[in-house]
C-alpha cells in the first residue's frame, strides 16, 4: 500500500510501483466520488457521509487487492480513521458519528483477518514539506481542493500534514518505509528508478529475511 498526505504524490508512486511489479494498481475513488465536492463546500454536513463512502469503497478495494501478490493499493484503510478523527476534532463529525464509524471500521478489520492475506506486505509512506503539498494541490487543479480564498481549508491541510507524521510513527499493521518525495521528484526518470530500487530492497528483506 502507499500512504501519505493529499497532494504528496502517492498516486503517481502507486502507478510506478504497479507498472514496475507488473501488477494492478487500485486507486482511491476520488474522480467518481459524488460526496467529495459536497464535503469541501460544506464539511459539517457531509463529513460523516464522506468517511462512510470512503470506508465502503476502500473495503471492497482491499478484498480485491489482497487476492493477488504485489497488487498496489493507493491509500489504506488504516488512514481513514486518521481523517475521521481529524474531522471530529474540527467539529465536522460528532462524537456519536465518530463512535459509529470506529465500530464499523473495527468490524471490517475483523473480517479482513479471515482473508488468506491479512495485511499488506509493505506500507510505503510518502512525505514532503508543506509548501510542496500546497503547490501540488494547486497544480492538479481540482476546484474543490483550492484554498487561495479559503484559509480554513489551508489550515485543515496543515493539520493533516502534521497528523500524518505522528500516524506514520505509530503505524504497526505491517512493515513500513518512508520515501522523501521532496528529494525524489517523480517526474524525473532517474528518481523513479532510485525510489523503485529502495522499495525492491525493502520487499526483498521482508520476503527473504536472513536466517540467523
Set out the residue ranges of the language-model regions.
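NTP-dependent small-molecule kinase module
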Residues: 138-212
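A basic- and aromatic-enriched beta-loop-alpha substructure that forms the phosphate/nucleotide-
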Residues: 58-101
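P-loop (Walker A) phosphate-binding loop of NTP-binding proteins
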Residues: 5
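Conserved substrate/cofactor phosphate-moiety recognition/catalytic segment
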Residues: 19-60, 82-86
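Conserved lysine of the Walker
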Residues: 10
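A glycine- and Lys/Arg-enriched "phosphate-lid" helix/loop adjacent to the NTP-binding pocket
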Residues: 83-163
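Hydrophobic anchor at the beta1->P-loop junction of P-loop NTPases
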Residues: 2
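Hydrophobic positions on the alpha1 helix immediately C-terminal to the Walker A/P-loop
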Residues: 13, 17
Amino acid at each position: 500500500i502507499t500512504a501519505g498526505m493529499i497532494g504528496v504524490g502517492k498516486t503517481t508512486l502507486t502507478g510506478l510501483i504497479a507498472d514496475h511489479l507488473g501488477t494492478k494498481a487500485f486507486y482511491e475513488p476520488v474522480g467518481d466520488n459524488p460526496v467529495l465536492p459536497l464535503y469541501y463546500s460544506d464539511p459539517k454536513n457531509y463529513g460523516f457521509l464522506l468517511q462512510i463512502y470512503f470506508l465502503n469503497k476502500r473495503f471492497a478495494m482491499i478484498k480485491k487487492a489482497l487476492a493477488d501478490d504485489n497488487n498496489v493499493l493507493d491509500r489504506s484503510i488504516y488512514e481513514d480513521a486518521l481523517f475521521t478523527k481529524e474531522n471530529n476534532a474540527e467539529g465536522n463529525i460528532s462524537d456519536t458519528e465518530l463512535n459509529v464509524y470506529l465500530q464499523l471500521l473495527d468490524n471490517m478489520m475483523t473480517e479482513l483477518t479471515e482473508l488468506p492475506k491479512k495485511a499488506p506486505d509493505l506500507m510505503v509512506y510518502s512525505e514532503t514539506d508543506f509548501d510542496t503539498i500546497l503547490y501540488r494541490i494547486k497544480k492538479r487543479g481540482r476546484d474543490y481542493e483550492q484554498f487561495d480564498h479559503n484559509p480554513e481549508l489551508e489550515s485543515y491541510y496543515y493539520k493533516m500534514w502534521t497528523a500524518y507524521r505522528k500516524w506514520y510513527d505509530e503505524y504497526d499493521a505491517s512493515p513500513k518505509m518512508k520515501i522523501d518525495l521532496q528529494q525524489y521528484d517523480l517526474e524525473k526518470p532517474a528518481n523513479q528508478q532510485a525510489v523503485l530500487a529502495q522499495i525492491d530492497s525493502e520487499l526483498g528483506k521482508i520476503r527473504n529475511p536472513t536466517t540467523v
